[in-house]
A protein has these predicted regions:
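Acidic (Asp/Glu)-rich catalytic clusters
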Residues: 339-341
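Short acidic catalytic loops
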Residues: 344-356
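Conserved small/polar residues in nucleotide/adenosyl-binding loops
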Residues: 360-361
Length: 362
């Protein structure tokens, strides 16, 4: 089974750090500090429902001179193209090694910095950057990213200024009975490892598409998607042979979650107004894309690589099962298809041809 990472974010043994405010930002460098407030989860009974609320916490760490109760940690913004920005948020003062030049998730052209045409060239994005007492804004003709200082929010807008989505803050719980954990990261009580949990607004009528090859509904709203490779052995479950940490919204934005760690994307399954991204990774490294689906896909594949055009027969009808075990059986199927005028371009033998060869030698 694919791991469901959401369980780690309701563990009472963990320490929770909630994104609170910008403690400083240098627009020239595109870097700043994000303040995180320390919380714990407190059990709570409401009539016949047992749940939990986030409650402020004072650390007992020793020596207290070496640790921060409410740490300031780095946030970084990079201009990628005219339709994309990269947002990286760290959960530790000791930053993990991130070497884009050796990263297999990136296309060679992206690494070289010369993908795209003159208007959308990777690394040459034209964004106007401004700062005020309330926020830092990256804006151009494609859209806008506002980094609100307090309460901290990442706010995405289209070219007309309409809010597409935004991160949630603890103050959003003031008017609700269900106290949803906002944008946070955890420090596990078991081993001090950290994982981050970006939480964004999910709007009424919003539709989400992506996350890789999936046999569930195309619109992922209402689903919890475990983005991790499993062998589902068929199309009857939500397991995925080929998960992809990328999705886009009909509201005009898309996210590439640059991570190979297991991730659980909760698109309004547990809370109708939120997309909750439970990540195994300690860093949020997101590429944010603006525009229509074709624009978003174009920018995403600039970063990760574009597939060459496949041969015509690959777009035809495939006949497959587990499994055809011999050439004779395959030819019999081919004759039956032709005799019954059933179109077919491919007969996929699947496991029948493996024989004694191990998976590692395929």
């Amino acid at each position: 089974q694919a791991p469901d990472m959401s369980g780690d974010f309701c563990d009472l043994a963990n320490t929770y750090f909630l994104a609170d405010s910008i403690a400083g930002f240098d627009t020239n460098k595109g870097e700043g500090l994000l303040n995180w407030k320390r919380y714990r989860l407190a059990p709570r009974q409401a009539f016949n429902l047992n749940g939990y609320w986030p409650v402020r916490m004072q650390m007992l760490d020793f020596p207290d001179t070496q640790y921060d109760n409410d740490p300031n940690l780095k946030i970084k913004i990079q201009k990628i193209s005219n339709r994309s920005l990269r947002v990286t948020i760290f959960t530790s003062p000791i930053e993990p090694k991130m070497n884009d030049a050796e990263d297999p998730m990136f296309a060679p052209d992206f690494i070289a910095g010369n993908a795209g045409n003159s208007n959308n060239r990777i690394g040459k994005g034209s964004w106007n950057t401004s700062a005020s007492a309330k926020s830092i804004v990256y804006k151009n003709e494609s859209g806008e990213l506002e980094i609100q200082k307090y309460p901290f929010r990442l706010i995405l807008r289209d070219a007309q200024g309409k809010i597409l989505t935004q991160t949630r803050h603890i103050v959003d719980n003031d008017s609700t009975q269900v106290k949803l954990l906002p944008f946070n990261f955890i420090k596990r009580g078991s081993d001090n490892s950290r994982s981050i949990n970006p939480v964004f607004l999910l709007s009424p009528g919003e539709r989400i598409y992506g996350c890789g090859e999936s046999f569930t509904s195309l619109n992922k709203v209402g689903q919890k998607v475990n983005i991790s490779v499993v062998d589902p052995q068929g199309p009857e479950t939500d397991g995925m042979y080929k998960p992809v940490p990328f999705y886009f919204s009909n509201r005009g934005y898309g996210f590439f979650m640059h991570t190979s760690a297991p991730t659980t994307a909760d698109f309004g399954a547990s809370y109708i107004g939120a997309q909750r991204l439970f990540m195994g990774d300690e860093v949020m490294d997101f590429f944010i894309f603006f525009g229509e689906p074709k624009d978003i896909l174009d920018q995403y594949t600039h970063v990760t690589g574009k597939s060459p055009m496949l041969p015509l027969w690959t777009f035809g009808t495939w006949m497959s099962r587990i499994s055809y075990f011999s050439q004779k059986e395959g030819l019999e199927i081919a004759h039956q298809l032709r005799n019954n005028h059933i179109p077919a371009d491919v007969i996929h033998f699947d496991t029948g041809w493996f024989g004694a060869v191990s998976y590692t030698h395929l």
